[in-house]
Every structure is written in C-alpha cells, then in structure tokens.
C-alpha cells in the first residue's frame, strides 16, 4: 500500500533503528508509533487545549517590555505539546525530531485545530522549519532545528514593501 511505501522512504528502510531506540523497526512498528502519537495528541487537546481555548480568547496575548507574551493558556498548551515531544514531528531524529511523514503530522494538526484553531496555527508553525531543512546548510540545521524540536523557538516572519509585518496593510492585486 501507498502508506507503507511512504514509511519506507521516510524511514530510509528503517535504518535509524540502530541509533535511536524510539525509531520504528518496520512498517507495523511505524504505524503503531503514529497511532500512539495521535492518541497522545487527542489526550492533550481534550485535557488541556480545548479547556483553555475560551480563556485564551478572553485573555489574549500581552505586549510589555518590547516583547509579546502569549496568554497563560497558550503557554500551558505549548508546554504540554513540547513535554509530549510533539515539536519537530517531521524532522530527522538526529535533530530531536520524530521523523514522521507529513500524513500523521497533518492528522495531529487537525486534532489540535479542532480544539482551538488559533493555537493550532501557533503549534503548526513548526512546519516552517521544513524550508530551512530543505534549503539550509549544515550549520543552520545544527543551530536551529534542534531548538525548534525542543520547543525553544519558532516564528513566522512576514514582510511586504510599505507594510512590514502588518498583514492588514498588505495589498494584493491580480491581473
């Protein structure tokens, strides 16, 4: 089946099993890992993220001392996801990731977004690291990817002429 082939390619025929004790041994083991991560994601969303959603909307982020701080519920949500090892899901294990194919990651993202779409957007910023992984050099990989997998940093920065990062001031014209 197609998912079996995807796993073989992503896992490079399961060669990480010699170096990482949590790497799958074969296709069945990989699918079991994905199922467990989906279960863990469901537990976190049901026990932490969904109950925090309304309070996060009411509190909102805060700006002080030149920094934006997330609402306390958002911080709790992020802490729970990081503690469960759910950052850097698609990144290689050598950087602290889970080396998952995009399919189980996307399934987790859907579960998270169903509980709190705003938090789903924040948590899924981890997919931005795919660009650095694909096009960055080894120095960039070693400096940034482990920190993202550990939940220490992540952002998405936008810029447009005459608007900077102010998305509401961006204009789009089609022809």
Annotate each language-model stretch with its function.
Residues 79, 106-110, 126-134, 156:
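Contiguous, well-ordered alpha-helical segments that form the cores/surfaces of helical PPI scaffolds
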Residues 123-124, 142-148:
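Beta-strand segments within the central parallel beta-sheet cores of soluble alpha/beta enzyme folds
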Residues 173-174:
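Conserved small/polar residues in nucleotide/adenosyl-binding loops
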Residues 95, 158-162:
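Short, flexible loop/turn elements at secondary-structure junctions
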